[in-house]
């Protein structure tokens, strides 16, 4: 009999949780992230059985491996999935587009907010609704409620809001760094009028500050218990789970020649918080045929440095002596590498110093490099113990040397490339100039991925098929796109006419509601005020603005 899937914290403890409890809890009380007790096996005939399935049908097949029917009956799970993806504009949900010989882009931005976060957050929103409705069924008092608190560098916030707006028994607070999201991203969040939505601009902050506030609130046992906090950031396992699906979907959309036995396939993923690419790693471990996953970072390059050196460093101890050759590759002329603080770049969703989901991979790396002695439970305990040591050192010193054995273990599945701002703009121009596969306007994060793909292809077999994840519609990042394509060689380019969808144009002039606060105490005070007001709308700053 197959072992029923449960979930445990990366940082220790013998307790395991059901899928429902792991989703509703989000972050473990000890600060760890929930991961499955085992990675399940695919059906032997999955390549033929799943070929031709729609995205919702494929989602059901994959998610069923991680969600027991005792937690969500099969028909209910399919209904949740169908509702989650009913608002996507593409029949394929996440279609691929050919951009070169053996090169494809996986467009993940056909959901309601035009960003890849919709894939996971539409699903997570439906999960929250389903679990709370079931728990509150037949109750007339003491109804269970969820206070969702999340941080965003732009796209997570709007996707979470659209996934949770007007859902009963849920109040959502989205924190973002004041002045450091694009006008369209802020408009998508702040123009939603639903009474359960609160957009919180944290003054004098960056994304890491906002994310740190969220983690602190979740780690505060009393505050968490009082308000029943729920997580929508990629620390929530359900988000990783939903994202696994589009790696399989992309595979099945490839020409048959690219899917034959022995064919080489690589995915390239613009990477900030490590959730998107971690989903690809789980897909690989499940059995999806691929060589490596390419981590594409911008100038906030802590991940690229880890895969190159084995050191995970967030402080100013890292000063690299670049030769002329490495400077040319890394684009040092576009600014010093990020070490002591987050650098604002043209790809802001990747402007992250510490990647929260990297902890999940570190657990598996600890497990792999600890040796094979002991029972499964003993090996798990040793891995958790080692991970705790790493995280304690990182918290204390701002850096941790994970060792050459860990770096080599990671290198079996990952390769990393760092892309500068200047190279990002050049890539946007390059794809707009393309003739064979037509002009293609890409957002700056996709441009980072495409640059990394081109570099990686020079080191790989020429018959490799490449899929680069496109994480946002270019309209979401007008500043970088217009900067790249405003040159004299593109006199006919008009951003509003050529790129901006009508749905986003309609945001112009709509009333915005924003709550501006200072630091953690300001966030706490706002949540306390809202929850004590019995869900009456707490006044926000109101205003209108152009995009």
Curated annotation (Swiss-Prot):
Its cofactor is pyridoxal 5'-phosphate. Pathway: Amino-acid biosynthesis; L-threonine biosynthesis; L-threonine from L-aspartate: step 5/5. One of its GO terms (molecular function) is threonine synthase activity. GO terms for biological process: threonine biosynthetic process. Its EC number is 4.2.3.1. Disulfide bonds: none annotated. InterPro entries: Ser/Thr_deHydtase_PyrdxlP-BS, Thr_synth_N, Thr_synth_N_sf, Thr_synthase-like, Threonine_Synthase, TrpB-like_PALP, TrpB-like_PALP_sf. Keywords: Amino-acid biosynthesis, Lyase, Pyridoxal phosphate, Threonine biosynthesis. CDD domains: Thr-synth_2 (cd01560). Pyridoxal 5'-phosphate binds at residues 272-274, 276, 471. The modification N6-(pyridoxal phosphate)lysine is found at residue 117. It catalyses: O-phospho-L-homoserine + H2O = L-threonine + phosphate. Belongs to the threonine synthase family. Catalyzes the gamma-elimination of phosphate from L-phosphohomoserine and the beta-addition of water to produce L-threonine. NCBIfam families: thrC. This is Threonine synthase. The gene is THR4.
């Amino acid at each position: 009999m197959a072992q029923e899937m449960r979930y445990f914290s990366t940082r220790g403890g013998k307790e395991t949780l059901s899928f429902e409890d792991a989703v509703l809890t989000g972050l473990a009380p000890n600060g760890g992230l929930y991961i499955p007790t085992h990675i399940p096996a695919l059906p032997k005939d999955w390549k033929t059985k799943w070929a031709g399935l729609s995205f919702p049908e494929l989602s059901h097949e994959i998610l069923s491996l991680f969600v027991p029917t005792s937690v969500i009956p099969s028909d209910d799970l399919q209904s949740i999935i169908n509702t989650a993806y009913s608002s996507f504009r593409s029949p394929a949900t996440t279609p691929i587009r050919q951009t070169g010989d053996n090169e494809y882009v996986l467009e993940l931005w056909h959901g309601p907010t035009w960003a890849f976060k919709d894939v996971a957050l539409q699903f997570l929103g439906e999960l929250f609704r389903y679990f709370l409705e079931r728990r509150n069924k037949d109750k007339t008092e003491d109804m269970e409620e969820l206070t969702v608190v999340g941080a965003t560098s732009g796209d997570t916030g709007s996707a979470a809001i659209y996934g949770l707006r007007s859902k009963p028994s849920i109040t959502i607070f989205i924190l973002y760094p004041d002045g450091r999201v694009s006008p369209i991203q802020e408009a998508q969040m702040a123009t939603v009028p639903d009474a359960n939505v609160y957009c919180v601009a944290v003054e004098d902050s960056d994304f890491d500050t906002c994310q740190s506030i969220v983690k602190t609130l979740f780690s505060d046992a009393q505050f968490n218990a009082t308000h029943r906090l729920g997580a929508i950031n990629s620390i929530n396992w359900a988000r990783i789970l939903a994202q696994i699906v589009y790696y399989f979907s992309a595979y099945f959309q490839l020409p048959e020649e690219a899917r034959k036995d022995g064919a080489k396939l690589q995915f390239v993923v613009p990477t900030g918080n490590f959730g998107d690419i971690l989903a690809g790693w789980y897909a690989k471990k499940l059995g999806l045929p691929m060589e490596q996953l390419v981590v594409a970072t911008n100038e906030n390059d802590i991940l690229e440095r880890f895969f190159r050196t084995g050191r995970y460093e967030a402080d100013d101890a890292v000063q690299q002596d670049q030769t002329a050759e490495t400077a040319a590759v890394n684009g040092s002329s576009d600014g010093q590498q990020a070490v002591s603080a987050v650098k604002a770049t043209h790809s802001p969703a990747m402007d992250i110093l510490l990647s929260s989901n990297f902890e999940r991979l570190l657990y598996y790396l600890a497990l792999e490099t600890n040796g094979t002695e002991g029972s499964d439970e003993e090996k798990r305990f040793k891995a958790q113990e080692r991970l705790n040591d790493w995280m304690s050192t990182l918290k204390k010193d701002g850096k941790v040397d994970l060792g050459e054995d860990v770096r080599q273990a990671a290198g079996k599945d990952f390769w990393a490339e760092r892309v500068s701002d200047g190279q990002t703009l050049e890539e946007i121009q390059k794809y707009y100039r393309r003739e064979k596969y037509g002009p293609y306007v890409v957002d700056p994060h996709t441009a980072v991925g495409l640059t990394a793909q081109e570099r990686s292809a020079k080191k790989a077999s020429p018959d490799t098929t490449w899929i680069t994840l496109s994480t946002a519609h270019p309209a979401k990042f007008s500043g970088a796109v217009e900067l790249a394509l405003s040159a004299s060689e593109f006199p006919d380019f008009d951003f509003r006419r050529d790129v901006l969808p009508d749905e986003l144009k309609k945001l112009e002039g709509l009333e915005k509601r924003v709550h501006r606060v200072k630091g953690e105490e300001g966030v706490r005070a706002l949540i306390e005020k809202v929850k004590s007001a019995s869900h009456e709308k707490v006044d926000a700053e109101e205003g209108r603005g152009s995009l």
